[in-house]
Amino acid sequence: MNVQRKLASTQLKPVLLGVLLATSAWSQAAPPEQARQSAPPTLSSKQYSVTSASIEALKLDPPKLPDLSGYTHAAVEAKIRRKPGGRIAAAMLQQTALKDFTGGSGRLREWIVRQGGMPHAIFIEGGYVELGQLARQLPANQFAETTPGVYVARVPIVVAPGATLHIGKNVKELRLSEERGAFLVNDGKLFITDTKLVGWSEKNNAPSAYRGPESFWAFLVSWGGTETYISRRPVASLGYNTSKAYGVSITQYTPEMHKRLKRPRPTGWLIDSVFEDIYYGFYCYEADDVVLKGNTYRDNIIYGIDPHDRSERLVIAENHVYGTKKKHGIIVSREVNNSWIINNRTHDNKLSGIVLDRNSEHNLVAYNEVYQNHSDGITLYESSNNLIWGNRLINNARHGIRMRNSVNIRIYENLSVVNQLTGIYGHIKDLSSTDRDFKLDPFDTKVSMIVVGGQLTGNGSSPISVDSPLSLELYRVEMLAPTKSSGLTFTGILEDKQEEILDLLVRRQKAVLIDPVVDLAQAEL
């Protein structure tokens, strides 16, 4: 089913400060940040040509969206195999699923201190187990029911391969004790439905309070080969700055362990739930086909949603992401490819609303409402071959859409209005003096884009600005002048080309191709 949600209208103040162009125009007003960037030599206006482009070649059908109708609470419940026979055992922490958290004497010592002796964990093995069974079979210093339906885990819980743990509607709340160092590890199948999962301070009898990135918070991690399903309940107060302990994580094992275990990639559905006050609201690494649908991510610490390294075919849809305290609302980073970021609402985040980062390609970013973020609406860093379609980018503190060192970016039918800098901004930046690993995260100082349809209105410095593009194609974009007193004018490399551009775009209703008449590689010599 190809359902394209018609985004709710947003009330905008009228912007009547310039001339409305019927089709498109291009502005080269460089935002202030550009002067501070180290970049390869740029080309002058004499080194660019303006010609008519093929309108037919720019035609593109609306993108086909994935069918979301099957991702429901009922479908999650139907996946649970309630086969009896699961076993519960307490054992020492020295197990494969815990190696990342107990390796080295320093980390093991932490659990010894927290548990007051040689550390143990609870292991779910061999079949289906409901959470209430743990309280009936384990001592209170490991797991207890404190009030009817409210349980506290005082040691880590591990779901072993082949086992299923169901935390369901008979559980009001599962609390993971901060003082005792409890956390939840899925190495099999985990279902959390109609209940609450929270990091808990027994000392304060309250949810754990964030005290800094290095202070322990409980967390949930699901390893390679696992399935994780969270449906219709809140998750809160989890995660800290330790590998794979970021909050709610679905991740392949480390490369060394993966070579030995050869587990398939993990997957899962997180639907219709609330994730709040978590170090990373969501994190994944080398995960496939994960679905994040209909969730609220609010007031999380570093990121709201953060899929990472080589994850594929993710669906990030119909989520509400806001109030992220340190960085971005939604970010996909390092070769997160072939995924859908659609019909989300992301606003009031510390930096950008949506980010594609570090060679994340062949993704669709469509029909999102992105507004009042403290940096850009949508940002692309070193991420080429992506389609940006039908988004509404309103009143962001910097650019509506920004792309750096990214080529073949198709920007169709977007509304980018009253952003404080530019509606659409493309630029290059030389990153060679930074500390990034260029083998892992290569870059090329090139930018190119196609802009078709949509509207750029009332943005602070210019509708569109670009720095030394490989090529630009423009067609059928409505524009109002920026709020600056000089109105809508071409500057920079296109200043001398203004008459040619307007003649094609406005008078002759043509598509415009702007590209260099010299080889950019030669121009940099």
From Swiss-Prot:
Q: Outline the inducing conditions.
A: Produced during vegetative growth.
Keywords linked to the UniProt accession: Alginate biosynthesis, Isomerase, Periplasm, Repeat, Signal
The way its activity is modulated is described as:
Inhibited by zinc.
Instruction: Offer one Pfam family short name for this entry.
Output: Beta_helix
**What GO MF terms are annotated?**
isomerase activity
For whether the record's keyword set contains Repeat, the answer is: yes
Q: Where is the active site?
A: H308
- SUPFAM superfamilies the UniProt entry points to: Pectin lyase-like
Compartments reported by the entry: Periplasm
The keyword Repeat belongs to this UniProt entry's keyword annotation: yes
Cellular component per GO? Answer: periplasmic space
- Which branch of life, at top level? Bacteria
SMART domains named in the record: CASH, PbH1
Gene3D superfamilies referenced in this protein's UniProt entry, alphabetically: Single-stranded right-handed beta-helix, Pectin lyase-like (2.160.20.10)
Q: Quickly give the catalysed reaction.
A: [(1->4)-beta-D-mannuronosyl](n) = [alginate](n)
* Biological process, per Gene Ontology: alginic acid biosynthetic process
Q: What span is annotated as the signal peptide, if there is one?
A: 1-29
More details: This epimerase does not require calcium for its activity. Probably cannot form G blocks.
Q: What does this protein do?
A: Catalyzes the epimerization of beta-D-mannuronate to alpha-L-guluronate during the synthesis of the linear polysaccharide alginate. In addition, is part of a periplasmic protein complex that protects alginate from degradation by AlgL by channeling the newly formed alginate polymer through a scaffold that transfers the alginate polymer through the periplasmic space to the outer membrane secretin AlgE.
Regarding protein family, the annotation reads: Belongs to the D-mannuronate C5-epimerase family.
Q: What is this protein's record name?
A: Mannuronan C5-epimerase AlgG
Q: Which organism is it from?
A: Azotobacter vinelandii
The gene that this protein is the product of is algG
